[in-house]
Amino acid sequence: MKTTALIMAGGKGERFWPKSRVNMPKQFLSLTDDGKTMIQLTVERISPLVDIKDVYIATNKNYRELVKQQLPGIPEENILCEPVGRNTAPCVGLGAVHVASKYDDAVMIVLPSDHLIKNNEVFADTFKEAVQIAEEGANLVTVGITPNYPETGYGLSLIHISEPTRPEPI
């Protein structure tokens, strides 16, 4: 089974104002000492896990050139421009349509472009475990933190945990 990645990079970065602006949102900014942007760090983090030709970037049409400049290794046809920004579900749907048109049987990992991940080794282990679970059947696997309260800006999934969770920070 093929593993693909969809990186969501269409946000305007409004919650990160004033550092982030509509013409240069958070995912295209360098917020760490190494000078790499958030989206570059995301691609770098998954590059040992997913072939670069199977990495898709879903973004706003206004950010297409920024994606091309910052991620020259991503095939141009893998830069998916959302016709209208409508948040996560339509973005994931757009990516799923493109992956399904290329592969009959694939796992699609969906990642935000602007998360700060401090432990890449734990991230990679978690990524591999999630892919393995997804490959075992028609499974939706989510990875995240345990929320303290519902937040409409991020969504909320209520789950029943049948297996113990791994309490390692990523």
Predicted regions and their residues:
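Conserved N-terminal catalytic core of the sugar/cofactor nucleotidyltransferase
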Residues: M1-I7, R15-P18, D33-P112, K118
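Conserved G/P- and acidic residue-centered "switch" motifs that form tight phosphate/ATP-binding loops
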Residues: G11
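Short acidic, glycine/serine/threonine-rich loops at helix termini
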Residues: W17-R21, Q69, N120-F123, T152-L158
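Short glycine-rich, Thr/Ser-proximal phosphate-binding strand/loop in the N-terminal lobe
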Residues: N23-L29
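Conserved beta-strand scaffold positions in the cores of enzyme catalytic domains, especially
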Residues: F28, I79, L140-T142
